[in-house]
Amino acid sequence: MADHLTANGEEMGVYNLQCIDLSNPDIHESAALLRKACMESGIFYVINHGISQEFMDETFAQFKRFFDLPIEEKMKLVWNKNLRGYRPPIQAVIDDKTKQKDFSEAFHIGVEVSEDDPNAHDFFYGPNLWPPADLLPGWRKAMEKYHQEATNVARKIGRVIAVALDLNEDFFVQPELIGSANANYTNMFHYGVHGANLLKDVVGTTPHCDLNLFTLLATDDIWGLQICREKNAESQVWEAIAPVKGAYIVNVGDMLEMLTNGIFRSILHRVVFNQERYSTGTFICPNHDYIIKCLPTCTSEENPPKYPTMRTGQYIYNRFNQLSASTVGKKA
């Protein structure tokens, strides 16, 4: 069976991404490539980001250790109201036409927050859930280390994005954006869990745009990620993205589209696959009190702001409420 498939099991085209080399001493050259990618599609590769392949391989081995646990152990860590912890397989129909199902499971972490933090129980923020140390020795330390390293890469990308938008290079690394990293979160994904017939079913995740600024996606060598560059088109054309060893795939999210007044485009994407697959996404988000409004370099009299001004926390809350409502509506 082909590596890259439509949701109906048909072969599809491959979209070739721009590649941003973070070791390039000429940040303006990198910024020009990034700007082109973000205007044309909203997705690109990042290489020479500072994380070794050995570290990435070990991190993916750690993901597998958790997902290999008995479901009874994983369910003891089922995600809380702050969306930290284990998200069990949905196993729900995600496409009414094809009757395809989502058999993925995930684990969600963020920056560790103590129980006595005044904001510890805010939506999408709060203490993490961890498996007992005697069950998975060293697992928490490995996951916290990965989250920290991925956030460091995000800061490097943020500098290139700033230059691409004619802003001060440090704009996105200020504390309320990427700098403090308080609102960033990392999700680990396992596709093709128990119950999926991988020789028959092509299973995946619902098409969506990420709500945050941008996402760092790392995958194993199994194909699965697909994009639609014309997200508002009536007839959507899907293209496969090749997994590249040692590279991050970076998705533009809706918040960055809003900040740039639509100059940078968030990318509609999904996962469709026919083999067991692992991936991880680190979602870069401003602090919840940050006001999302059009950047001064992205508006003019001829191009007034297109999006409403909104506090980040309220935007996240609204988006998840919409998602919950659409899910309930679909099941009904």
Swiss-Prot record:
Q: How is the cofactor bound?
A: Binds 1 Fe(2+) ion per subunit.
What does the entry list as the binding residues for Fe cation? H208, D210, H269
Expression sites (tissue/organ)? Mainly expressed in petioles and, to a lower extent, in roots.
GO MF terms here are:
dioxygenase activity; metal ion binding
Per the entry, what this protein does is:
2-oxoglutarate-Fe(II) type oxidoreductase involved in the biosynthesis of limonoids triterpene natural products such as azadirachtin, an antifeedant widely used as bioinsecticide, and possessing many medicinal applications including anti-tumoral, anti-malarial, anti-rheumatic, antibacterial, anti-inflammatory, anti-pyretic and diuretic effects. Catalyzes the formation of azadirone.
SUPFAM superfamilies attached to this UniProt entry: Clavaminate synthase-like
This protein's record includes keyword Methyltransferase: no
Q: What is its EC number?
A: 1.14.11.-
Keyword field contains Iron: yes
Organism of this sequence: Melia azedarach (Chinaberry tree)
- Chemical reaction(s) catalysed: (1S,3bR,4R,5aR,9aR,9bR,11aS)-1-(1-hydroxy-4-oxobutan-2-yl)-3b,6,6,9a,11a-pentamethyl-7-oxo-1H,2H,3bH,4H,5H,5aH,6H,7H,9aH,9bH,10H,11H,11aH-cyclopenta[a]phenanthren-4-yl acetate + 2-oxoglutarate + O2 = azadirone + succinate + CO2 + 2 H2O
One of its GO biological process terms is: biosynthetic process
Q: Name the domain of life this protein comes from.
A: Eukaryota
The coenzyme or cofactor needed here is: Fe(2+)
What's in the keyword line of the UniProt record? Iron, Metal-binding, Oxidoreductase
Family from the record: Belongs to the iron/ascorbate-dependent oxidoreductase family.
Q: Which residues form the Fe2OG dioxygenase domain?
A: 181-286
**Matching Pfam families, A to Z?**
2OG-FeII_Oxy, DIOX_N
Q: InterPro entries this protein is in?
A: DIOX_N, IPNS-like_FE2OG_OXY, IPNS-like_sf, Oxoglu/Fe-dep_dioxygenase_dom
Which pathway does this chain act in?
A: Secondary metabolite biosynthesis; terpenoid biosynthesis
Under the heading Gene3D superfamilies, the entry gives: B-lactam Antibiotic, Isopenicillin N Synthase, Chain
The residues the record assigns to binding 2-oxoglutarate are: R277
Protein name (database record) = Azadirone synthase LFS
